[in-house]
A protein has these predicted regions:
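Glycine-rich phosphate/ribose-binding loops and adjacent secondary-structure elements
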Residues: 41, 208-211, 220-344
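Hydrophobic alpha-helical packing residues
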Residues: 71, 210-217, 248, 277, ...
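Low-complexity intrinsically disordered segments
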Residues: 1, 25-26, 34, 40
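Hydrophobic alpha-helical signal/anchor motif
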Residues: 2-3, 9-15, 19, 24-29
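Conserved, mostly hydrophobic/aromatic
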Residues: 71, 103, 138, 180, ...
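Non-catalytic, usually N-terminal nucleic-acid engagement modules in DNA/RNA processing proteins
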Residues: 40-223, 335-338
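C-terminal extensions of enzymes
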Residues: 40-65, 73-77, 88-89, 192-195, ...
Length: 441
């Protein structure tokens, strides 16, 4: 039996076989390559549909299947970030071979360059970037509000100046919907006001505006083949988060995101808000934690009922010589790796670990060779996708609590200074990362 948002239904055919065998864990955008699963493509499905496959008995973790017009997305899942219609240094074929079923693209950046109208005339974002998997687009709100002095906000919308040429732009809920419909993503996000998490007065004001904008987005959204997710805001204040969840669930979006986290609050505060907020969201709809994507945050987020994650962290760190291992981050610039013949991670099946040593990767990083950026990115994305697969398997087999304890006890979490998306040690002052403050990957 699989639980949906309507009623329990018995699956039939290949999808049922995949779920019954626990092999939902392997479903990707090309499921025929994984464990022999023959899953039909859902080419004419009107929008996203979420199936809750299995719950963990010892936590809020769950396994699900998100149906999109561009294939099945097993959850929990990590979405690589392709800000400008590309995951930096990787091709769509790379992502396919890594097993990524869904990526995120950025509305703000694509609206400014090359323009959503241009992309629409060229057949939409999937065709434009030659990606046949699912795409989630944000509304552009986070990038606009990160401009700080370059924007002005009112109930009508937000006026801002382009970081590219200084031109004045105006973004409203209706325009955010129009742009995302032109892009043709599988999942679109409402326009919301992103805030500093600790300022209660500002959060109260912004929350009212976020709810008004959510209603306007819902009225303006017209594409039947695109799911629109609401975004719960409210900073670190449980009562504001509860109010936001109440208002947005009443609007009956097909999915819900938790926004405004990992923007300055402590990890303990973030985890506490997730624990209190996730249970307030509909059980049979997907839950998306926006912009959060360190390995430990994936594990702790899944334990609290989150299904979907995205973050620039894995790709940004990779381009600056930092890679993930089972015991934490490795800084390949360290002299200790100068003659290290080992792969980044013993037993890792990614191309980088199958082929190259830490010593060689360190050489590429120090020599600033482009290949180093690519190989490190391949590993970090593989690590995140494999972590999601491992969690799906653990939930399916009833061993998630043991896995979580083992992972957290062995994984050395970066300190607070390094957690800020790789500032200082992990992110050298290079021009290629100078736009990190406006949400580039």
């Amino acid at each position: 039996m699989v639980v949906t948002g309507r009623q329990p239904v018995r699956q039939v055919g290949a999808v049922a076989q995949a779920v019954d065998a626990g092999r939902v864990l392997a479903v990707t955008i090309n499921p025929q390559q994984d464990a022999g699963i023959q899953v039909p493509r859902l080419t004419n499905q009107p929008s996203s549909c979420f199936e809750l496959v299995q719950r963990d008995s010892g936590s809020a973790a769950r396994v699900g299947l998100l149906h999109t017009p561009h294939g099945l997305v097993p959850t929990p899942i990590f979405c690589p970030v392709g800000t400008q219609a590309t995951v930096k240094t990787l091709s769509p074929q790379d992502l396919l071979e890594l097993g990524a079923p869904m990526i995120l693209a950025n509305t703000y950046h694509l609206y400014l360059r090359p323009g959503s109208a241009t992309i629409a005339r060229l057949g939409g974002l999937h065709r434009f970037m030659a990606w046949d998997g699912a795409i989630l687009t944000d509304s552009g709100g986070y990038q606009v509000f990160s401009l700080q002095t370059l924007r002005q906000v009112s109930d009508d919308g937000v006026t801002f100046r382009s970081h590219l040429d200084g031109s004045e732009q105006y973004l409203t809920p209706e325009k955010a919907m129009f742009i995302q419909e032109e892009l043709g993503s599988d999942i679109a996000m409402v326009l919301d006001e992103c805030t500093q998490p600790l300022d209660r007065a500002y959060n109260v004001q912004a929350l009212r505006r976020t709810h008004l904008w959510a209603e306007r987005c819902l009225r303006a959204h017209t594409r039947a083949d695109q799911a629109l997710f609401g975004i719960v805001q409210g900073g670190v204040f449980p009562d504001l988060r509860a109010e936001s969840a109440r208002v947005l669930t009443a609007l009956d979006f097909p999915g819900y995101a938790v926004g405004g986290l990992s923007v300055g609050e402590s990890k303990e505060q973030m985890y506490s808000i997730l624990e209190q907020t996730a249970p307030l969201l509909p059980e049979f709809k997907p839950r998306y934690l926006m912009g959060v994507g360190s390995p430990e945050d994936l594990v702790e987020g899944v334990a609290r009922g989150i299904d979907i994650f995205d973050c620039v962290l894995p790709t940004r760190l990779a381009r600056n010589g930092a890679v993930f291992g089972p015991e934490g981050r490795l800084n390949l610039r360290n002299a200790s790796y100068r003659e290290d013949p080992r792969p980044i991670q013993d037993g890792c099946t990614c191309y980088t670990c199958r082929t190259f040593s830490r010593a060689y990767l360190r050489h590429l990083v120090l020599a600033e060779e482009i290949l180093g950026l690519r190989l490190n990115t391949v590993h970090n994305i593989h690590f995140m996708l494999q972590l999601a697969r491992t969690m799906r398997l653990a939930i399916s087999e009833g061993t998630f609590s043991a896995f979580r304890h083992d992972f957290i006890s062995h994984y050395n979490v970066a300190n607070a200074d390094l957690r800020a998306e790789g500032h200082h040690t992990w992110r050298p002052s290079k021009p290629r990362d100078s736009k990190a403050s406006i949400g580039e990957d």
